Amino acid sequence: MAVPGRRNGVMDEEDDEDDVLFDDGDALADLDLDSDVPPHLRALVEAAESGNVHALRSALDNHTGSIDEPVEDGDTVLHLSCLYGYFPCVQLLLERGASLESKDEEGAIPLHDACAGGFTEIVQCMLNSAGSPDFVMQLLSATDIEGDTPLHHAARGEHLDVVKLLLAAGASPKKTNIYGKIPAELADQETEVRSILIAAAASADEVSCQ
């Protein structure tokens, strides 16, 4: 699904209408439900996009298919709830068994969307739900079609708390995307996010040399 505008150290010439902005965790404006959303999934999408956890619970109770069925653009309902930042909806979906590993058309898992939006509480919840340390690392290392990890997305959005959380959980500050950029290079110059990521990468270098 949509994530904050790309910044990979190269000039991106994208139309303004393609840029998606997140402001202090505010949800995106509601998307219009169109023919791309199958009729039997529209109740799920409406609930996820509005953050109505009661409507979502009802829609799930009446849904006979998979909870991980793509609803639009390859997104699952969990992707949408993470994208919009609706924590109660994320909690409900995880309780119902929604997959943390489902990928959308851009290769992103729900954690990518939560990190892109700077939704710290959701990110923490998803890492807690992973269960094992190995699965946590699997999620932290997941890459989308541009080779970005969740940490790349958090860095690009300059979400300090999420960056700190991901680093503490074991995310690599040295992983490069397909443009050869580490997370620090996606944050603006002279920001705390960039400084923390540069320091983390340097520390990782020191450890690897020991």
Description of each model-found segment:
Residues 2-43, 168-169, 178-210:
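Ankyrin-repeat-protein effector appendages
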Residues 29-77:
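N-terminal segments that cap or nucleate solenoid repeat domains
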Residues 37, 71, 104, 143-144, ...:
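Ankyrin repeat boundary/linker residues
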Residues 46-51, 80-86, 113-119, 153-159, ...:
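Ankyrin repeat A-helix N-terminal signature
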Residues 55, 88-89, 121-122, 161-162, ...:
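Conserved ankyrin/ankyrin-like repeat signature
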Residues 60-65, 91-98, 125-138, 164-171, ...:
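Ankyrin repeat domain, specifically the short helix-to-loop turn at the C-terminus of the second helix
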Residues 105-108, 112-138:
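Alpha-helical adaptor scaffolds
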